[in-house]
Amino acid sequence: MVIDQVKKDIEEWLINFVEVPHPALGNWAPCPYARRARKLNQYSVRLGDDVERDLFLFAKKQYMGKNDVIIYAYPAKQYDDAYFNFIVDVMNNSKGFKKRNLIALGDHPDTIEEHNGVRFNMGKYALVLLQDKVKLHNHAKLLALKGYYDGWDEEYLQDVFTHRRDPRL
């Protein structure tokens, strides 16, 4: 993988999908904060090497800095989706992630994430999106107050909120 191409592909996904309001989502964008983060250059894309090692070292030695999200990209076939999601789950439960209030959101092309017929996966790479859990919760709370989660499937939302507090409460 070439970093410039990966960055371009992810930026196109953000512009053409993640930031775009969708009728099946109540005319909300899949991530209402993505456009702002992209425009203000508050995200970083990195080529991942080893998902477990990358996340462990991030939790131990690195910081979010000005970024709202740090995205690690891996070739889609480097990991099967079960193992990839298992590692992301293990890291979310790790002492390092809890101590630093980090959350890792996995996106593997073979794990279909769909709501109301809208498929959320990036599709080309296996991604780990790292965010500050407190900041994410505060943004999600504001969205909940505005009705963002109204009409979403409860089972899907429970999966989304697995490693964080439900902002609707």
Which residues fall in each region the model found?
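Expand to "…catalyze enediolate/carbanion chemistry for C-C bond making/breaking, isomerization
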Residues: 1-169
